[in-house]
Curated annotation (Swiss-Prot):
Belongs to the ATPase B chain family. The chain crosses the membrane at residues 24-44. This is ATP synthase subunit b'. Disulfide bonds: none annotated. Its main location: membrane. It is found in: Cellular thylakoid membrane. CDD domains: ATP-synt_Fo_b. InterPro entries: ATP_synth_b, ATP_synth_b/b'su_bac/chlpt, ATP_synthase_B_chain. It comes from the Bacteria. F(1)F(0) ATP synthase produces ATP from ADP in the presence of a proton or sodium gradient. F-type ATPases consist of two structural domains, F(1) containing the extramembraneous catalytic core and F(0) containing the membrane proton channel, linked together by a central stalk and a peripheral stalk. During catalysis, ATP synthesis in the catalytic domain of F(1) is coupled via a rotary mechanism of the central stalk subunits to proton translocation. PANTHER family: ATP SYNTHASE SUBUNIT B', CHLOROPLASTIC.
């Protein structure tokens, strides 16, 4: 065990120096750090930054595209609503016109039917009057004939 203590004491005496020894270790560590920084920058940070920039551009492009499409959709919606309102007005005008035309046609047909009915009634009245005149004339003839027969029978009895 003494041998180990002696070796440890010699090692402590040989490692004399302050906090910073100016030997080749310090510049070598600085070179290693610079090489590590350049390697990390080339291998990791630049590609990672490029991916982030590409993603940011993609998101911005998507947003701009979405805004443009939204504006287009709003414009088309407004246009379609205007066209729909115009079409509704036209259809209402057509319906009103059709109703007016149907009313006019119905009134014409009703007037025509009334005229035809009046004409048929007048014709029937004329036929009835003619038949009445014929019947009255036939009755007058029969009355005359019966009156002559009655008169002849009365005169024949007397």
């Amino acid at each position: 065990m003494n041998a180990w203590m002696i070796l440890a004491a010699e090692a402590v005496q040989e490692a004399e120096g302050g906090l910073f020894d100016l030997d080749a270790t310090l510049p070598l560590m600085a070179v290693q750090i610079l090489v590590l920084v350049f390697l990390l920058n080339a291998v990791f940070y630049k590609p990672f930054g490029k991916v982030l920039d590409d993603r940011d551009q993609f998101v911005r492009g998507g947003r701009q595209d979405a805004k443009a499409r939204l504006a287009e959709v709003k414009a088309l919606t407004a246009q379609y609503e205007q066209e729909l309102a115009a079409t509704r007005k036209q259809s209402q005008a057509l319906i009103a016109e059709a109703q007016t035309e149907a009313g006019r046609i119905a009134a014409q047909q009703l007037a025509e039917a009334q005229r035809e009915a009046q004409a048929q009634r007048e014709q029937a009245q004329q036929e009835i009057d003619q038949q009445k005149a014929v019947a009255l004339q036939a009755l007058d003839q029969q009355v005359d004939a019966l009156s002559h027969q009655i008169l002849d029978k009365l005169l024949a009895r007397a």
